[in-house]
Structure formats: structure tokens, C-alpha cells
Amino acid sequence: MKLDKNKIQISIGKNPSKTFYKLQLLLKDHFPENLKTKFSFQTASGIFTGENGQIFTDEVEKIIYLGLGETSKIKIRGVAQHFFQFGEKLKKWEGVGLEIHLPKVLTNSLSADLVVYQIVNSLEQGVYAINVLAKEYKENSKKIGNVSFILQDAAKLKEAEKGLKRGKIVSRYINGVRHIAHLPANHFTPEEFVSRSKEIAKDNGLKITVFDEPQLKKEKMGGILSVCEGSDKKAKMILLEYTPVKPITKKKLAIIGKGLTFDSGGISIKPAQDMHEMKYDMCGAATAIHAIGAIAELGLGVPVIAAIGVAENMPDAAAIKPGDVYTAYNGITVEVQNTDAEGRLVLGDVLSYVGKKFKPDYMLDLATLTGAIIISLGHEAAGVMSNSDVLTNLLKEASISSDERIWEMPLWEEYSEDLKSDIADIRNVAGRAGGSLSAAKFLERFVEPGIAWAHIDIAGTAWRKKTSGTQIGNGPTGYGVRLLVDLVEKIGKKK
């Protein structure tokens, strides 16, 4: 399954389209005097004063004015959030382009690199159709108009070009995550995960290793194997390795992803309402393989491994039952008291394997692991639990620069108390209280000593209904790709 190309031709300079709108970004406290005169009625009546989110269109001159509010309050998320709608407009306009004019005050307040980068990401996400299985999608595809940027401050041109190049690459992989995450489980199976991973590896010169069921049994990966016992779709573990041509550090990062292509809950079956959303339970794995693709295409100088465990959790006569005990890859015995807490079983084996075989300096996992994290943080941030202040701080820095929000949660030893089993080394659930935290403590049992590790629970950020900042709504978001790209850059700069 190939990764789609970018949908928009984006450049810096005059728009090459025959027909296009100029999009003029305006700050409320830097409102041009000529426009105050030209649109005296609109400004006097409050129809358009440059408030954040206000839009006024001059159809005669084909100019759209977009207000961004006051300069002192401007943030990149407040700029980027407006461009999803313009991506959607481009999708509907037949070949009509957009020439975006960036005022000097904006590129002085926020770097031209960052502004162009995040606008490109928002436009590409907005234009990307997710109704790919609909008859309408197949029959009514329209030509997308060109987009260009005009900078008032010519001195910021190189910065803008850097952001444009980066945005074109990263947005493609974000949409790659969104595309496969939105496909239903009968269209995207564990085998399709292998196909997608092979294409990303082929495009970027990555080494790929696929563990099918016989290899998983040989390696005694009881966690992954136990989850798929009720499904006719066989489990996989997929490893992608990126070795930079010009490494700038010997530090190695491992990215682990949870890939449940569908999670019914198994014997501990989920409620019927919204169960269709459990096709999104593979977003952690989707992010892992697309992030390493973006990292490789950008040519970042840090060695990276992406490893994902892929399975389908279904009820069946052969399915694992509450109370069953399995032996994990690292030899720990696990009592499964709830088959709907299956993601941690998959992750445990992958964490152990990667830790033993690759000995990374930094290792993190991304997983739609617990509903409890949504109760804690809503859909605005992913929860981070880590055994390393160094890695946590690197993630915080990457979160700020990428505008993909995280929030640190505790990993105190007390949260592991209720994971004790009376028959095995550990059980897979610890009750409702602190559910995200006890889940992280479970995973910690599978991390090799000496590895700086972080667990990122993306259950609240992997998909959402409403757009917020740099995160698109109405389905999967592709959360984590920008965060991981920025994290790798931070690791490369760390001395």
C-alpha cells in the first residue's frame, strides 16, 4: 500500500494559477490605514476588525482578509487552526489557487520557518479527503489549485523555504497516518500493515524485518500471540531501522507502537456504542512507521528504530479468557483478568524485544492505551509517563516546538501495588482508579534496565471530533508525527 503524494503544489512567490484568491493575514493592532478607509463600514460596525478568526472577502478584487487578533497574543496554533478550512475550500474549488500574504509583523513575532511549516501542514490535512471508500470520492475528484506564499519581509525568504520543504515532507506522513487509521478493519488488516511498512521502507532505504506467527512463537512472544487467538488475522511484529548517512550522534532512539487493527475487547467485550471507533486502536503503530519515514526523508542525523506489534482482538472459542495466564517474551507470567486491556500485552513483548536486541539509549511507546487518559486530559494532550527526566524534558521541548501537546503524569511505585496477582508475576489490570498510571507501571516491567523510556498515551489525541490548534477534527489526527520529528532533532542537538 503506497503512501499518497501531496495533494497541493505549494511554492514561494507569485501564484502560478490562472485564477486565485489572495489571502491577506492581518493583525488587529497593525490594521492597514488604507483598509480602514476602504472598509470603513465593516470596521466601524465590527464586521471585520482583525479579531482572531474573522474573515472578510472582497469578491471584486478576489482578496480574502483573515484576522489573527493582537500581536502580543498570537501563537502558532492560533494561526494554523484557520488553514484547515482553506484546505477544505481548495478541495471544493475547481483549480482555484491561494496566494498567502504573510505580513512582516507576523514573521517577526513567529519565525517564518514555523509559520510556513504549520500552515502547509494544515492546508494539506484540510484538503485530504478521508471518504476514500465513497462512490462520490471516486467520481468527483477535482483539480486542486496551487498555493503560494508572499513574504512582506524578503529577509525571511530562506527561513520560509526551510519551513516549506519540511512541511511538504511531514504533512505527507501525517496524512499517511490519517489515511490508514480511518480505513475500517476489513480494509486494513495486520497484513496491510506489513504492506504499508514495506512501502515506507522501500521509499526511504530502511531495513525492514517482519515476524509472522511462526517467528513470534519461536521467540516465545506470549503477549502478542495471546491477543490474536480469537481472530483469523494473524499477529505480526514489524521492525524498521533507519541509519543516517551522516550521523550527528551515537544516541539511538526506538519508537514502539501499538497496532490493534480492531479491538472488540475480546471476551471482555466492549459496549456496542461507538465500537466502530476501535479501528483507531492502531494509531500508535501507524504513527511509529510514518514518523520514521518522515525522519528518514528529512535526513535527520539520529539512528532510529520503529517497532510495532500488530494484531486483532476478537471473541472466539479459541480467544484468551479472563483468568488465563501467559508467559511474556521476557519470561514474566501475566494473568489476564480483562481481555480488553490487550494493548499492553502486545507492547510488553515489543518493548522487551527491542530493549534486549537493540539496546537503544532512548525508547518510547505510543498507544491508544486507556480511556482513563481522556478523563484526565480530554483531547488536548497526550499523557506522558517516564522513568527519565532527560527524556521527559526532551519530549516537553519537542511538544512546544511541534505544538503537539503532552502532559507529564506520575509513575510512582504505589501505582503498581494493585497489579499484583495471586497466581502469576503480574496481572494486566489494577482497577479504575489511576488506570493510565497503572497501565504505564505494567509496561515498565518490560523495559530493560538502563534504558530511558517514556510511555505516551494518545487515546485522547489520536482522533477527535473538533479541530483544536494544529490538530484537525472529524476523525484521526496523525498526532505524534510532528512531535517525534522534533524529538529526533532535539536528541541530535543534545550534547
Swiss-Prot record:
Q: Which residues bind Mn(2+) 2?
A: 258, 263, 281, 342
Name of the protein in its database record: Probable cytosol aminopeptidase
Q: What is its main location?
A: cytoplasm
Provide the catalytic activity annotation: Release of an N-terminal amino acid, Xaa-|-Yaa-, in which Xaa is preferably Leu, but may be other amino acids including Pro although not Arg or Lys, and Yaa may be Pro. Amino acid amides and methyl esters are also readily hydrolyzed, but rates on arylamides are exceedingly low; Release of an N-terminal amino acid, preferentially leucine, but not glutamic or aspartic acids
Q: Which PROSITE patterns match?
A: CYTOSOL_AP (PS00631)
Q: What keywords appear on the UniProt entry? A: Aminopeptidase, Cytoplasm, Hydrolase, Manganese, Metal-binding, Protease
Q: Which gene encodes it?
A: pepA
UniProt organism field: Leptospira interrogans serogroup Icterohaemorrhagiae serovar Lai (strain 56601)
Q: Which GO terms describe its biological process?
A: proteolysis
What cofactors does the UniProt entry give for this protein? Mn(2+)
Tell me the function of this protein.
Answer: Presumably involved in the processing and regular turnover of intracellular proteins. Catalyzes the removal of unsubstituted N-terminal amino acids from various peptides.
Q: Which SUPFAM superfamilies match?
A: Macro domain-like, Zn-dependent exopeptidases
Q: Which domain of life is it from?
A: Bacteria
- GO MF annotation terms: manganese ion binding; metalloaminopeptidase activity; peptidase activity
The GO cellular component terms are: cytoplasm
- Active site residues of this protein: 270, 344
